[in-house]
């Protein structure tokens, strides 16, 4: 009988610990999703809130001819040139999904999402809709520390010329 009681108590303790961890990860994900919404809105408004990125943030994307990784100062320069010529519109509300730690497979507060973005060349009026996948990892302060995106960005933008 004592073994059964001890087993029940140990099981209850283990499940309560997991529940607290899950709750913390869920709260982190919710906060990080709010950060993502603010970043995407500021991007569409051509006024990116760069304070939401860590000073050490690393960007990794699929730009033809770009280095494997980009730093925040490089992204700022890319944005400046891009916003001078193009306008963007997000085609639907975002559906943020919880990301996972690639080593453990456990939810970790990171945010991933798929979306369509319409890009219009403001000089000639040509537009293209680009399907994009992005994921963002965050540090303990809730700032983006690792950003990756996948899309056919180079060909899509070239089609607007």
Where are these regions (language model features)?
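Sec-dependent signal peptide recognition
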Residues: 2-7
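C-terminal motif of bacterial Sec signal peptides marking the signal peptidase cleavage site
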Residues: 13-16
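C-terminal and inter-domain tail/linker signature
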Residues: 18-161
């Amino acid at each position: 009988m004592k073994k059964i009681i001890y087993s029940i108590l140990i099981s209850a303790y283990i499940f309560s610990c997991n529940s607290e961890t899950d709750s913390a990860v869920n709260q982190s994900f919710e906060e990080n999703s709010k950060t993502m919404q603010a970043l995407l809105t500021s991007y569409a408004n051509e006024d990116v809130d760069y304070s939401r990125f860590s000073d050490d943030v690393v960007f990794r994307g699929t730009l033809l001819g770009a280095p494997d990784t980009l730093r925040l100062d490089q992204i700022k320069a890319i944005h400046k040139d891009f916003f001078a010529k193009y306008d963007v519109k997000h085609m639907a509300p975002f559906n943020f999904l919880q990301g996972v730690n690639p080593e453990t497979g456990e939810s970790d507060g990171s945010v991933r999402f798929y979306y369509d973005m319409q890009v219009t060349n403001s000089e000639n009026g040509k537009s293209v809709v680009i399907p994009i996948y992005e994921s963002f990892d965050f540090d303990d302060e809730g700032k983006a520390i690792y950003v990756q995106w996948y899309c056919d960005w180079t060909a899509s933008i070239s089609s607007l010329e």
